[in-house]
């Protein structure tokens, strides 16, 4: 099969031929039709993600959508010819999705939403799993909650907004002036990120604070999240790194939880839950409650590194996809 590999951290990919994997007894062999890209892929590629190592030479790519080519003797949930999607590799020694085929743990898969193309489905797995784990598993979002999303225009941010709206939360999201349209189309009330926290908390919550806050940006945005949450509220972060003062949170008796979406890929624990999340998201998509946001640029395996460069340059608010097969 053809695959795009890189030999050294930070170096461009090159397309090579490598043995096609086979489905072991507990595997699903997927013919990959599209590979979605994520900012995390950039950090894995340049070796800067200490929490997400992938030693070169290797194939990158976390997300994909494709067609079941073969199933192992122990696999009962999928059949040859079914269209699937998932976050299945590209970290922890697992082959990535910039390849024509991958042997995949079926627990990481779900049937692709019937109303999406392979390209559209391939950009969803990481961002919707991250959003779901923070909103549903950690903060238990519910109807009527006032939710603040720190960084609402990115892939995770727009997924958080749409999933929270599905649960009938009242959603607000921060972003730059240029991101206002993306945030509002996703379904949130826009807050310009330059506005002081005390000002928008006063303006939108009467000074009480938000019931729940989902931080997608980390750094100063996480500190702002602690300031913006109400007493007994909850903050979840997908980028809760570095040093942060907990006093603003503690003095409100508010709680915090981190979201580490890669844990099941790296450790093997909790993979079935990822598949269940993707199944629920597929139902949302088919009901018209969630839509992916893609860039119009097209890439192939031969130009996959160009997709990574486009992502690094932030040439589009939509996600970039590599077409395969």
Role assignments for model-derived ranges:
Residues 72-74, 171-182, 219-222, 242-243:
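Short glycine/proline-centered loop/turn elements that form peptide/ligand docking sites
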Residues 282-294, 305-325:
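C-terminal capping/lid region of NAD(P)-dependent oxidoreductase domains
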């Amino acid at each position: 099969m053809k695959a795009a590999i890189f030999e050294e951290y930070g170096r461009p990919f090159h397309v090579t031929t490598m043995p096609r994997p086979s489905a072991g007894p507990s595997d699903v062999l997927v013919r990959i039709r599209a590979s979605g890209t994520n900012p995390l892929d950039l950090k894995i590629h340049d070796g800067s993600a200490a929490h997400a190592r992938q030693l070169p030479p290797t194939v990158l790519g976390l997300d994909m959508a494709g067609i079941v080519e073969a199933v192992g003797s122990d696999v009962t949930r999928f059949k040859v010819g079914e269209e699937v999607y998932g976050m299945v590799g590209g970290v922890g020694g697992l082959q990535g999705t910039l390849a024509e085929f991958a042997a995949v743990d079926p627990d990481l898969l779900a049937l692709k939403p019937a109303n999406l193309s392979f390209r559209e489905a391939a950009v969803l797995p990481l961002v919707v799993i991250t959003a779901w784990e923070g909103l549903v598993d950690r903060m238990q979002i519910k109807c009527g909650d006032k939710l603040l999303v720190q960084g609402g225009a990115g892939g995770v941010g727009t997924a958080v907004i749409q999933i929270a709206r599905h649960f009938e939360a009242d959603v607000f999201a921060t972003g730059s002036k240029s991101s206002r349209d993306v945030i509002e189309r996703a379904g949130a009330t826009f807050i310009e990120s330059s506005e002081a926290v005390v000002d928008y908390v006063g303006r939108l919550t009467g000074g009480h604070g938000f019931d729940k806050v989902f931080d997608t940006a980390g750094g100063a945005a996480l500190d702002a999240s602690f300031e913006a949450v109400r007493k007994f509220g909850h903050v979840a972060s997908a980028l809760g790194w570095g040093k942060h003062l907990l006093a603003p949170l503690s003095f409100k008796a508010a709680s915090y939880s981190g979201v580490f979406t890669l844990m099941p890929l790296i450790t093997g624990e909790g993979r079935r839950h990822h598949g269940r999340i993707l199944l629920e998201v597929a139902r949302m998509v088919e009901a018209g409650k969630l839509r992916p946001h893609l860039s119009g640029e097209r890439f192939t395996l031969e130009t996959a590194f160009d997709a990574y460069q486009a992502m690094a340059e932030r040439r589009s608010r939509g996600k970039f996809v590599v077409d395969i097969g």
